């Protein structure tokens, strides 16, 4: 089974300017993500950027880069441009891996690609069981529920499913596994433009979750529990220091 990984890498970041080029153990962050994706067995790994500094850094370590417009309103629009420019066939599987996850396990990149290949949905993604009770009621932790076949019924920032009897108690004990969505997607390349042709749904606007557009329009998203929980991505200088420490410890 063949698949391509696309890694968006924007230089501008409100909380961490120049994030893709941040040094981690002597390599820019984007190189770490690239190498993790290569270990997943992808046919091609393409870094999508609108910044020449990122382009030069990628070329310096021998990576493949696709320059994209700086005017995209979403990551999906950027992905569509890459598919068009790189002439990726409509039936080919494309995995979108965020450029700020230098420690993402290669196994889950491969997993989401394999899962899409094995099902009839146009999209697939992953989730992890929530172990921290604080996440259950945290709107920044997106929850997902599926049907018996592993297709998403709904994604929400709210707590779903709501355990009526147990949550009625003062301690709101968590007695069943809830799933937190993680932001890795596999697409059939031809579906990306279909998605962009659809108008945003009201649910998508309310929850601020783009994937709800797919469910609103009657398509399916396959969801599986990740083989391995990925470490948190890098959003802040503090996150960057955590990753640097992890890399330094592994090198000892």
Curated annotation (Swiss-Prot):
A Pfam family annotated for this chain is CTP_transf_3
Q: In which pathway does it act?
A: Nucleotide-sugar biosynthesis; CMP-3-deoxy-D-manno-octulosonate biosynthesis; CMP-3-deoxy-D-manno-octulosonate from 3-deoxy-D-manno-octulosonate and CTP: step 1/1; Bacterial outer membrane biogenesis; lipopolysaccharide biosynthesis
**Main location per the UniProt record:** cytoplasm
Q: Which UniProt keywords apply?
A: Cytoplasm, Lipopolysaccharide biosynthesis, Nucleotidyltransferase, Transferase
Reactions catalysed according to its record: 3-deoxy-alpha-D-manno-oct-2-ulosonate + CTP = CMP-3-deoxy-beta-D-manno-octulosonate + diphosphate
Gene Ontology molecular-function annotations: 3-deoxy-manno-octulosonate cytidylyltransferase activity
Q: Where is the signal peptide?
A: none
Q: Which SUPFAM superfamilies match?
A: Nucleotide-diphospho-sugar transferases
Location of this chain's protein in the cell: Cytoplasm
Give me the Gene Ontology terms describing cellular component: cytosol
From what superkingdom does this record's organism come? Answer: Bacteria
State the function annotated in the UniProt record. Answer: Activates KDO (a required 8-carbon sugar) for incorporation into bacterial lipopolysaccharide in Gram-negative bacteria.
Q: What family does the Swiss-Prot or TrEMBL record give for this protein?
A: Belongs to the KdsB family.
In Swiss-Prot or TrEMBL terms, this protein is called 3-deoxy-manno-octulosonate cytidylyltransferase
Task: Tell me which species this is from.
Answer: Vibrio cholerae serotype O1 (strain ATCC 39315 / El Tor Inaba N16961)
